[in-house]
Amino acid sequence: MIWEVTKLRISMILSAIAILVLGFALIYGILGYFFGFSNAPLLITGALAFVTIFTILQWLFGPALIKSIYHLTEVDPTDPQYGWVYNLVQEVAMYNRMNTPKVYIANVPFPNAFAFESPIYGKNMAITLPLLRMLTPEEVKAVIGHEIGHLRHKDTELLLAVGLIPTLLYWIGYGLWWGGLLGGGGGGRNDNSGILFLIGIALIAFSFLFNLFVLFLNRMREAYADVNSAITVPNGAKNLQTALAKIVLSTDPDIIERYKKKYGQIGSMLLFSGFQINEDIPAYKVQELVEYWRNIKVSPFADIFSDHPHPAKRIQLLEKLTHTQ
């Protein structure tokens, strides 16, 4: 287990560094070539300041938008109906040696759980009503352990920082595209408006490529949150496996057969998702799907466009961790 956790942590750190270094190197090279390498740092600083301001505003006030979209209602320990949910979050927070975040119930018609934070709104966790009805309390604790992991690991801040790179590439590319479209200007290399136009398009394309790198980092972040649940919550690995299976089965009760007929076809790679849900799921189907995920070989590219790992990859990682509990 120690090696699995260490390998995942090192991979996340190296991936984040690689995205930042390669991104800034590409931006510096392009701007330096067209506007002079002495001017490139100033241009990068200006563009970075512009993008960072909007990113910080999103970070600071994003929780207010989340609360509105998900119709969140805060829960406290004395709540006669959902006080037990607060107690579960408090218990898992204690396992993780952190203060209990604010707990919310989300009145939306699909199973989901998520954590979010900002300096203004603090640490928060929300669980939707269908998820609470679908899972056992032990499975809910495992899900909470996953979400607490996101808070512990400062995942919001990590993604905002790394996400600056594709955003910078896009807006600089967009600016060069317009510069080329309007005829360049400024003398020297900048007279070649056609090159500016093409480089702008190339940078926009690179921004989408770097978004794939960010998705790769995000999948590791999700796996690391799974690990957090497995190592901090009693029986967290086993319970998170069955929770994931229940949530997937709730979107399509016959999904096992669909897996067998056409590999990899699943409506969503999100851990907690679905809209047409079935909350009454037979235990044998849960175990059958978990067993299926444990034994299939997943293509490295099965989740390349997803921000979550393929469910089978998650189950197989959690299965390794069950032997340590």
From Swiss-Prot:
Any one Gene Ontology MF annotation carried by this entry is: metalloendopeptidase activity
For this chain's record, the cofactor binding note is:
Binds 1 zinc ion per subunit.
Q: Which terms under GO biological process does the entry name?
A: proteolysis
GO cellular component terms, A-Z: plasma membrane
Q: Which InterPro entries match?
A: HtpX_protease, Pept_M48_protease_HtpX, Peptidase_M48
Q: Where in the cell is it found?
A: Cell membrane
Q: Where is the active site?
A: 147
Transmembrane region(s):
17-37, 42-62, 158-178, 195-215
Record's keyword annotation contains Coiled coil? no
Please state the protein's primary subcellular location. membrane
EC numbers, comma separated: 3.4.24.-
Bilayer disposition of the protein: Multi-pass membrane protein
- The positions annotated for binding Zn(2+) are 146, 150, 222
NCBIfam families from the UniProt entry: PRK01265.1
The record's similarity note reads: Belongs to the peptidase M48B family.
Q: What is this protein called?
A: Protease HtpX homolog 2
Q: Which organism is it from?
A: Sulfurisphaera tokodaii (strain DSM 16993 / JCM 10545 / NBRC 100140 / 7)
